[in-house]
Each structure stands twice: as structure tokens, then as C-alpha cells.
Regions:
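Conserved amphipathic alpha-helical "coupling/scaffold" segments
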Residues: 1-223
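Short, ordered beta-strand-loop transition motifs
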Residues: 158-159, 231, 235, 253-254, ...
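Extended, EK/Q-rich alpha-helical coiled-coil segments that serve as long dimerization/scaffolding arms
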Residues: 171-185, 219-277
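Generic structural signal for well-ordered, non-transmembrane alpha-helical segments
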Residues: 201-215, 232, 277, 306, ...
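Coiled-coil heptad-register positions
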Residues: 211, 218-232, 239, 280, ...
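Extended, charged coiled-coil "arm/hinge" scaffolds of SMC/Rad50-like chromosome-maintenance ATPases
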Residues: 247-320
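Charged, amphipathic alpha-helical linker segments immediately N-terminal to NTP-binding catalytic cores
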Residues: 307-359
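ATPase nucleotide-binding head domains, primarily ABC-like/P-loop NTPase cores
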Residues: 343-589
Length: 589
């Protein structure tokens, strides 16, 4: 296969990968989603991630129909990545994509939840041991040696169920043999590494010391001349000196000494050069013997090594996702095939949870659902128009539904106590973008309408469409979008402040509302974020005006806010500010 057939790989990138990896290795790295291999070849991590997402999930990536949907997808991966136990696990999380069918989603879900349950039942000390083993694996770039050593360390922790079972079943003796072989063969270039063979290490040490003496031969001559005068004495003194200083066998030193020399310096230099050459040959010979033995040992353990790399990589990935699931109390969604729906009970927005905000769980649904009894949304309505208070969590609810749908179709657990999800082909999430520019309106319509008109199932999540055009036209366009969504048998939630202008809605659509309930003792707006079904929400501006009146320090400014209070309903404002002084005399002050 040509590299340029992959999305995002042009002539320049193809040439780089071909040069650094070769075509076959590059193709293998792309097909196996190996970010590490591509970044070592010179690609940036971000570029490698984009290429691999398309290579491994090109068709499923069409689910991300708008920029805002893609932003939610990336934010979810960022949250999951924070819980990665190795860099390679983080790389694999970054290239997770929506899956093409329900069977694949269920399979990944089961793996993640099995890992979650195993991790949750593991005591803290064992968790620390497991994380330390993964950290050790991460510290040497995730190579085969590191994977084998990590497998051995994980076996020592005693964890042997779930994602750790493939590691626990590996033969420890084979892993030990493989670790020694890999450690020996991981020297620079073709060099056998230090520690692989005691004899080889000894020869290398002797060679290094002799080479150091070659560089300081005049000092050696001077020292020997102080001890010996006659040639035979000088020869014996050199043998004793080199044996003492380098540990080289006396016979090898005598064999290296020249029979004739012009003077003492020539004799010492010739002997040292000859001895260094002899040791160099001995090192090469021993290294070749050791390398051959190590390669035989590694070949015998090859199957175990490959299994260890795969098992450790998979365990790292699923432990990372398990930690993500536990951190946010994620649960298994129920996939439904006989009806179209997205329905959640006790759903929570992950972005708010990550920020440390207090999150009110909400229950919501569109389509035909079968949520457990309780505050159950109406069933059968394919489209909902969501209205209500400013800062009432309407956009957050859209984002939460987007998170649930995306995570489910990625085969990951979702942030809800219960969730029913029908699979869709496109998620059209569109945030509020305030601009009356005609270009913005056109680009918005081009992004939200085609997924509806294309063949396939669509989830529409559209926020305050009126923000991009004047109210009259916005109401007409939004009514058209709602109608089109119903006619195309899609699902949708549309946030708007123009509910009254949208009547009458199509039969399969309803209106829901979020209500502001008052001000707290600290004059913070209190909102019930749980939508009330089949009713128009109220933004209750008197609460906002009440807060402005109470907080106004300047008398003139307060008078202005009191005028606004009369406009929105002075009685309501007085009721809200029951603890605040409200009289003409106060405002005159």
C-alpha cells in the first residue's frame, strides 16, 4: 500500500516515513495506531494523532459532523488522557475514535468495565505497585525490554484477573531469559550491552585501561625506568606493571611485548599498541559469541516477548480508562436498536466535574425511551425545544447529551446513572456564536443542514440559533429546522428564547423549560437545572434586577436599577429583596 493513500500523508510526509522507517514499517505503524513509532520517525505528536485517527476510524469519524462536536470529542480524550498510566497509553487514548458497530462498542465497554471493577477491588498498596511497574515501563520509551520487565513486575504484584490475566499466564522463566537477552542486545549500534556477560565486561574494562595507558605512555616509561635498568628487567617490570594496573593476564602481556625496540619508549608504546589490538580482537570475538547466544535465547522467547508487549500495552490502556471511569463514576449505557432515542437519568457534565463545580444531575430524553420510573421525561417526542433562564444550564445540557452519545459510540462508559442510546451516523452540536454576519449564518446552515438531508440517523443539538440573525428570521429558520428534523426522523434538542414564536410545533416535538427560582442569601441566582417537561421556562429577569438593586453602592445608580425594577414588576422585586430596604426614602439617601 502506498503511504500517500492514507489521510493526511502527502509527498513530504511519505518521504520522511519511507526514509526513517521504510514503507512496510510505516504502514505497520499506521495500521496498528503506533504513535510512538511515527513520532520517533520525526512527525509531531499532534500530526501523528490526526493521521492515526483517520486511518483507524475514518468512516466512524464522520459522526463528528460539526466543529463543536469535534471540540467535545477532543475534550473527552483530554480528560481520559489525564488518567493514563504510561505515555504510550496516552497516545492510544488520543487515537480512540467512535466505533463502526454495536458489537465493537459492547466489546470495548466490557473490557473497560472489567478493568474498572478489577481496579476498584484492588487495595491501595497493590495499586501503587502496579502504577510503579507501569512507570518503570514508561521510563525507557516502551521498548520490548521495558515491556518484559514490566510484565515480570506486574506478576510480582499478584494481580491476575481481568486485563492482567494475559500477563499472569506468561511463563516467568521465559520472561527472565528474554529480559537478559534484550538487555544484552540493547547496546549502542550492534554492540552487546554491558552486563550481558562477565567475561566480555572484563575484556572491555581491560581494553579501556590499556587505551588510557597508550595516551600516557611517557609517564609509564618514566615509572618503569626508575625500577629497571637492564632490558630483561625492563620487560619484566612492564609485565608486572600492566598486570597490576589493568588485570590483563601476564602471558598476554608478554606475548604483546616486541622482541626488538629502538629504545624504552618505543618498547612501551609498541607493547601497549599490540596489547590494545589483541584485547580489541578478543572483545570482538567474545561479543560475537555472546550476541549469537543472546539472539538464540531471544528467538526462543520471541512468542513470549510479543505476548508481553501486547499484554502490557493493553493493560496500560484499560487501566488508564478504568481510572477515568472511576474518577467520574461512569456507567454502561444501554444500546437500543428497535427505536431512536437518547435518554439519561442522573446525567452529569464532565467538563463541570473536572472544573470542580457542584453539578446537579439531570434527567432528560428525546425519542422512545424506557428509563426507570421516577422523574421520567415524556416518551415518543423526537424533538424538544428547550427554553428558560439565562445561565440556566441549557447549553450544558446539550453538551452533556453530546458527551453521552460520543462516549457510548466510542465504546466507553457514560456520565449518567442510566442511559439509553440509539446509534446515530452524525452528531450536529452547534454552540451559540453571537454574530449577525451573513457569512456566519450561511456557514452555520451549511454545517447543520446537510447531515439532516443525508441518508442516515442524526442527532441535532443546536444552541440559540437566534444569536446569528435577527429574531423574526431566526424564529422562521428555527421552526424550519425543527420541522426538518421531525420530517427526517432525526432526534434533536434546540435551545431558544423564541419558544412562543415557534408555535405550533410539529406533532412529534415538545417544549421544555428550565426555571430560575430566586436568589440565595449571597444574592447568587438559584436555578433548578432539571428541565420541566412540556412547559416554557422562565428567565425571571426580576431576580437579576433585584441583585443589581441590592448591590448598587451609588445612589444614582441604584435609582436607575429601581426604574428597571418597576418595568419588570416592582412587587416581584420587593418580594425577592425581602431582606433589603426598599422605599423612596432609602433611594433618596
Amino acid at each position: 500500500m502506498r503511504l500517500e493513500e492514507y489521510w493526511g500523508i502527502g509527498p513530504k510526509t511519505s518521504a520522511l516515513l519511507s526514509s526513517e522507517l521504510g514503507v512496510d514499517r510505516a504502514v505497520a505503524a499506521i495500521e496498528s495506531a503506533d504513535t510512538r513509532e511515527l513520532t520517533k520517525a520525526g512527525l509531531s505528536r499532534g500530526r501523528a494523532t490526526r493521521i492515526l485517527r483517520r486511518a483507524t476510524g475514518a468512516e466512524a469519524m464522520d459522526l463528528l459532523a460539526t466543529r463543536d462536536t469535534r471540540d467535545v470529542y477532543k475534550a473527552l480524550l483530554d480528560l481520559a488522557e489525564e488518567h493514563a498510566v504510561t505515555e504510550h497509553a496516552a497516545d492510544r487514548i488520543r487515537v480512540l475514535t467512535p466505533l463502526p458497530d454495536r458489537a465493537a462498542m459492547e466489546e470495548r465497554l466490557s473490557s473497560v468495565l472489567d478493568a474498572r471493577d478489577a481496579w476498584a477491588s484492588t487495595d491501595e498498596a497493590t495499586r501503587d505497585d502496579v502504577l510503579a511497574a507501569f512507570d518503570r515501563y514508561d521510563s525507557v520509551d516502551g521498548g520490548e525490554l521495558s515491556a518484559v520487565r514490566t510484565a515480570l513486575a506486574l506478576q510480582e504484584t499478584g494481580v491476575d484477573d481481568g486485563v492482567f490475566e494475559p500477563i499472569a499466564t506468561l511463563e516467568s522463566d521465559r520472561l527472565d531469559d528474554a529480559a537478559r537477552a534484550l538487555a544484552g542486545l540493547r547496546g549502542d549500534g550492534d554492540r552487546v550491552g554491558d552486563g550481558a556477560d562477565d567475561q566480555l565486561d572484563g575484556l572491555r574494562d581491560q581494553l579501556g585501561q590499556v587505551e588510557d595507558l597508550v595516551a600516557t605512555s611517557p609517564e609509564v616509561v618514566e615509572e618503569l625506568q626508575s625500577e629497571a635498568r637492564r632490558p630483561d628487567e625492563f620487560r619484566d617490570a612492564l609485565t608486572r606493571y600492566l598486570t597490576s594496573e589493568t588485570g590483563v593476564d601476564a602471558a598476554r602481556v608478554r606475548d604483546a611485548a616486541p622482541q626488538e625496540a629502538a629504545d624504552a619508549r618505543d618498547f612501551v608504546e609498541s607493547a601497549l599498541r599490540s596489547l590494545a589490538g589483541d584485547l580489541r580482537s578478543a572483545v570482538d570475538e567474545r561479543e560475537a559469541t555472546v550476541a549469537a547466544t543472546l539472539e538464540e535465547d531471544l528467538a526462543a522467547a520471541r512468542e513470549t516477548v510479543d505476548a508481553a508487549v501486547e499484554a502490557v500495552d493493553d493493560a496500560a490502556l484499560y487501566v488508564s480508562l478504568a481510572r477515568f471511569a472511576l474518577a467520574y463514576d461512569l456507567t454502561r449505557p444501554t444500546f437500543v436498536a428497535d427505536r431512536e432515542t437518547i435518554a439519561v437519568r442522573g446525567a452529569r457534565n464532565l467538563a463541570l466535574q473536572d472544573a470542580g463545580d457542584d453539578v446537579q444531575p439531570v434527567t432528560y430524553a428525546v425519542g422512545d425511551h424506557d428509563l426507570p420510573a421516577g422523574r421520567e421525561p415524556p416518551t415518543g417526542d423526537r424533538v424538544a425545544v428547550l427554553t428558560g433562564a439565562n445561565s440556566g444550564g441549557k447549553t450544558t445540557l446539550l453538551e452533556t447529551l453530546c458527551q453521552v452519545q460520543l462516549l457510548a459510540q466510542m465504546g466507553l462508559p457514560v456520565p449518567a446513572d442510566d442511559a439509553e442510546v440509539g446509534l446515530v451516523d452524525a452528531i450536529v452540536f452547534h454552540r451559540r456564536h453571537a454574530s449577525f454576519n451573513a457569512g456566519v449564518l450561511e456557514s452555520t446552515l451549511r454545517s447543520v443542514v446537510p447531515p439532516l438531508t443525508d441518508a442516515g440517523r442524526t442527532l441535532m443539538l443546536v444552541d440559540e440559533f437566534e444569536a446569528i440573525t435577527e429574531p423574526g428570521s431566526a424564529a422562521n429558520l428555527l421552526h424550519g429546522l425543527v420541522t426538518l428534523t421531525v420530517e427526517r426522523d432525526a432526534l434533536g434538542v434546540f435551545v431558544t428564547h423564541l419558544a412562543d414564536d415557534l408555535e405550533p410545533l410539529p406533532e412529534a416535538a415538545r417544549t421544555d423549560g428550565i426555571f430560575a427560582e430566586g436568589l440565595s442569601p449571597d444574592l447568587d441566582l438559584e436555578v433548578d437545572y432539571q428541565p420541566r417537561f412540556e412547559t416554557v421556562g422562565k428567565s425571571t429577569p426580576e431576580f437579576i434586577v433585584s441583585r443589581l438593586v441590592a448591590n448598587a453602592a451609588d445612589p444614582v445608580e441604584r435609582t436607575g436599577f429601581e426604574t428597571l425594577a418597576q418595568a419588570v414588576g416592582e412587587e416581584a422585586v420587593q418580594r425577592t429583596l425581602s431582606d433589603a430596604r426598599w422605599s423612596e426614602g432609602d433611594s433618596d439617601d
